């Protein structure tokens, strides 16, 4: 099963299955001298951890164990290996799907490709969103390394089911959405999302949603003009996330309904610098980052595993039957998915920042390490509940 690695210079390989002993990641290419602790990783992991309000009831502590690559709270330049042990596994929930593939899930395609006898039906195996633990761990490292360029990344849930944000949102509000149980950037929207989730849970159903991630102060010129355009790199990274079905940046598909005179973003002076009036392009032109806020969105489909009975095939006799999936599943995977999208944006940007020479390949100086640490601490302080930010 190839295709488990991402990136060229900052290279990430995830491993593990949903109901195996552990999931984890190996991160290769991290320069020496980056201040990094378990707490830095746990800060990001907490926002995708199950067992919280409105998400999967699986009670995982998600305690990262660093196996290599860090000494005295600094990276050594060698590969960083981190595992998270699976401590709340209940495989008995999945005995029925052993013979009844779930509609909307990867069960049947996996059986068709790898063979029934090789299929790990427990919790979806490698196709489970549990795999994204490794992405978020690597994303935490990437986010901290990007602090060298003072680049900040934060996301929120732009829509959930029929409810959506129809007003402007500040980056500070997006940062604070980390502490919203439904990743809403506005209090009134949070209440609407919560009502939808409660309704879906009662009905044994689920909802999809749209995640939006904003990158402040991205380095200029990241990406390459042809096959490695930044939009293409981000699209691949984000579309690789389980349950993601669509990607756009800037105005996205809306631009197809506009005239050139409407869609072209005028070039103006902004704070004594050259810039764009509205940032319609979402921070990418010609495949390169242009210094404006990098704005991407992606669509998450509704959780496939639901209690409502759905038609499927019993593989023992190839007859049609029904399945009602019993287990601990998210009523909306998009909620925890926001953190994963942030991580994939960070992994893409840090890899290109290293390719462009913005971030050193070998080591950070002591001064650079101190700058990174100061900015990271400011970032962590800025991520606080809405009430504390008086939103």
Swiss-Prot record:
One of its GO terms (biological process) is chorismate biosynthetic process. Its EC number is 4.2.3.5. The keyword Cell membrane does not apply. This is Chorismate synthase. It holds the Pfam family Chorismate_synt. GO terms for cellular component: cytosol. It catalyses: 5-O-(1-carboxyvinyl)-3-phosphoshikimate = chorismate + phosphate. Gene3D superfamilies: Chorismate synthase AroC. The keyword Cell inner membrane does not apply. Pathway: Metabolic intermediate biosynthesis; chorismate biosynthesis; chorismate from D-erythrose 4-phosphate and phosphoenolpyruvate: step 7/7. GO terms for molecular function: chorismate synthase activity; FMN binding. Its cofactor is FMNH2. Belongs to the chorismate synthase family. This reaction introduces a second double bond into the aromatic ring system. HAMAP family: Chorismate_synth. NADP(+) binds at residue 48. Keywords: Amino-acid biosynthesis, Aromatic amino acid biosynthesis, FAD, Flavoprotein, FMN, Lyase, NADP. FMN binds at residues 126-128, 286, 301-305, 328.
């Amino acid at each position: 099963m190839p295709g488990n690695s991402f990136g060229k210079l900052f290279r990430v390989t995830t491993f593990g299955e949903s109901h195996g002993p552990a999931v984890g990641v190996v991160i290769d290419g991290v320069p020496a001298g980056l201040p990094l602790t378990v707490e830095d990783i746990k800060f990001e992991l907490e926002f995708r951890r199950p067992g919280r309000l409105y998400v999967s009831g699986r009670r995982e502590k998600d305690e990262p164990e660093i196996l290599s690559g860090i000494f005295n709270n600094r990276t050594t330049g060698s590969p960083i290996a981190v595992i998270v042990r699976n401590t709340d596994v209940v495989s008995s929930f999945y005995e029925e799907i052993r013979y009844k593939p779930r509609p909307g899930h990867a069960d049947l395609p996996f059986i068709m490709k790898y063979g029934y006898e090789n299929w790990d039906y427990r919790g979806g195996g490698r196709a489970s969103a549990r795999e994204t633990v490794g992405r978020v761990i690597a994303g935490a490292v990437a986010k901290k390394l990007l602090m060298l360029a003072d680049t900040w990344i934060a996301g929120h849930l732009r829509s959930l089911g029929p409810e959506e944000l129809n007003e402007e949102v500040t980056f500070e509000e997006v940062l604070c959405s980390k502490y919203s149980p439904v990743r809403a950037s506005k209090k009134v929207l949070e209440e609407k999302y919560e009502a939808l989730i409660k309704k879906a849970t009662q009905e044994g159903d689920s909802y999809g949603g749209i995640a939006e991630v904003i990158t402040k102060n991205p380095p200029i010129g990241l990406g390459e003009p042809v096959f490695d355009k930044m939009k293409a790199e981000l699209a691949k990274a984000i579309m690789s996330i389980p349950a993601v079905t669509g990607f756009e940046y800037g105005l996205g598909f809306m631009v197809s309904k506009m005239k050139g005179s409407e869609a072209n973003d005028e070039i103006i002076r902004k704070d004594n610098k050259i810039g764009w009036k509205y940032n319609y392009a979402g921070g990418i032109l010609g495949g390169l980052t242009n210094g404006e806020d990098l704005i991407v969105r992606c669509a998450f489909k509704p959780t496939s595993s639901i209690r409502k009975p759905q038609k499927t095939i019993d593989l023992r006799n190839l007859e049609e039957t029904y399945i009602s999936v019993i287990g601990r599943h998210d009523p909306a995977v998009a909620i925890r998915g926001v953190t994963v999208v942030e991580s994939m944006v960070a992994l893409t940007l840090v890899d290109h920042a290293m390719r462009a020479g913005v971030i050193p390949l070998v080591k950070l100086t002591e001064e650079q390490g101190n700058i990174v640490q100061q900015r990271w601490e400011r970032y962590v302080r800025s991520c606080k509940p809405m009430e504390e930010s008086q939103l």
